[in-house]
Amino acid sequence: MDIYDSVRNIIANIERVPSTTQEGIAPIGRAAQWSRYTGITVESVVDTVVEACEQEAKRLGIPVVIAIVDASGSLVYQRRMERALGVSIELAPNKAYTAVAFRCGTEKLGAVVQPGTPLYGIETMVKRPIVLFGGGEPLMLENHLIGGLGISGGTVKEDVLIVN
């Protein structure tokens, strides 16, 4: 299965997500249920993730905005480093949301939505802003999506270095 097949499957599942599963658990409820058993939530990893991103941004000498969303795409944390670009305040959370919505990095998604591909124009078909260049990654823990991370402020290459 190539990346195109993976993203097509993700899109198909997004369109068909039921309000509840056969077990009667809402999909987001399943993530919450997993969190109750493990004690691991996106909020519990925020400090670690932010510290790692800030250290890398400082090492590169790039002021950035760091945004973290939960598994539903809701913003749980945002920090703007001194001198970070103003537009990054919007881009970072949108990158994090995109990573959660498609369950893949924004750089990978951008590669499969180019003209001539089956997903071309997907960003115009949804209400929330979708970012199609690097800087957003899903936060996975034990094969569970717990949230998304968005970095904005440097070049795309620099944002990708920091987010990874």
Label each PLM-derived region with a short phrase.
Residues D2-N164:
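Flexible, solvent-exposed loop/hinge segments and secondary-structure transition points
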